[in-house]
Amino acid sequence: MKKALAFLLAAVMLLGLGTVAMADSVTLNVVTSYGGDDGNRANFEAAVKAYEESTGNKVNDGSATSNEEWKAKVLTDFETGSEPDVLFFFTNADAEPFISAGKVVSIDEIRAEYPDFATNMKSSMMAVAADGKQYSVPSSGYWENMFVNKAVLADCGVEVPGPDYTWDQFLADCETIKAAGYTPIACSLVEVPHYWFEFMVMNNGTVANHLDVPASADDAAAAKWAAGLNDIKALYEAGYFPANTLTASDAETVELFNAGEAAFLIDGSWKVGYFTQNAADLNDFAIAYVPGKGERSASEAIGGISMGYFITRKAWDDPAKRAAAVEFVSQLTSDEVLSTFVTTEVTALVNGASPAGLNPLQQSAADANANITAIAGAVQDLLTAEARGDLFANVQNVVTGKISAEDAVAQAIALN
């Protein structure tokens, strides 16, 4: 009888514990852009499943395809009080309406209670809102950096550039490469001068002020733009670009690099796919660093992480959901989970992403991205199409001395 009573009491206690666990579990309303047609949909579903299994919580997934209609609905939901608990959204000006309305919680406020929140991220690569605070935990994005042909460099006795690569080292390497009969820089200045323009502007400024657009022809931003154009001119005059850089297409100069006739190519993360499909041997290529000059380090690059996870005020102020929301974002942005979402994309992870199954060039990109200390978006994106077109059309005129760099900048900003 005593044994039976003891068994019954134990069963009641277990049932009670189960009831408490069920009562403590919550359902989070989550909205992301990982809709059905997104390439990372399966990775997102796997991460959500792991979260649910590890916490006992449930996720009401409101993900959809990222488009203007989706963005408008997200903003409308905040206006009507129908916002989710966790939102994966753009971190640029698109987020300002709900940030300025106090509808999301800052990273600092979250860390006051959860000190380890998002500490696996580089603060310098986290988006800053208009009020100077950070609100989102970043995911991944694009990068622009320098591809190198290792076979060419080896034949010239030149080392693959590291994150401390300097402008003086670069100029010396270019001279060595040129003397060996190779083209140092693969680039069509008539079609894609913008890659070099971005980095030369940053080399004459800082990553912090890279997105400053000239307001007049004689302000500080205009001066660094002109200095950047003059650096491109100096490279042209030294004979470091292809002989046909003013007439060749981008495809032609990229193939020059791919064929082992040129050493350096500045391009973006999207170009990795091209070489994966077209390179004879991916081991001949690597992602390195654009040489630094002045205050810019070679470990600072052009790129962008345009989206991140926000915790809404609604979830934060709900005692039942606060911890659940923090844990959800922490899991979705952990080193392990975020690594499943990327191949070569840049992340803000302190330790860098560790994606699996990468080919040699993809692995090289992942290794390089792990050393990136800061990124800035492309300043050309802040220009009108007319101003941008005029500026880049004049690059060939600047390098050939038909127009001064200062006049080219003044002419472009007059159209902006």
Q: Model segments located where?
A:
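A structural signal for short loop-to-beta-strand junctions that line the ligand-binding cleft
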Residues: 76-77, 84-85, 116-152, 183-184, ...
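C-terminal capping/gating helix-and-loop segments adjacent to ligand/active sites or protein-protein/ligand interfaces
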Residues: 129, 303, 343-353, 363-416
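Short, solvent-exposed loop/beta-turn-alpha elements that line the ligand-binding surface or hinge
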Residues: 108-120, 162-163, 205-227, 277-280, ...
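Extracytoplasmic/periplasmic solute-binding protein
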Residues: 131-139, 144, 169-217, 233, ...
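Extracytoplasmic/periplasmic substrate-recognition and gating elements
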Residues: 49, 53-54, 58, 80, ...
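Hinge/lid segment of periplasmic solute-binding proteins
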Residues: 90-145, 171, 196-202, 284-288, ...
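Glycine-centered hinge/linker elements that transmit conformational signals in sensory
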Residues: 171-176, 214-246
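Conserved N-terminal structural module of periplasmic/extracytoplasmic solute-binding proteins
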Residues: 6, 21-96, 100-101, 112, ...
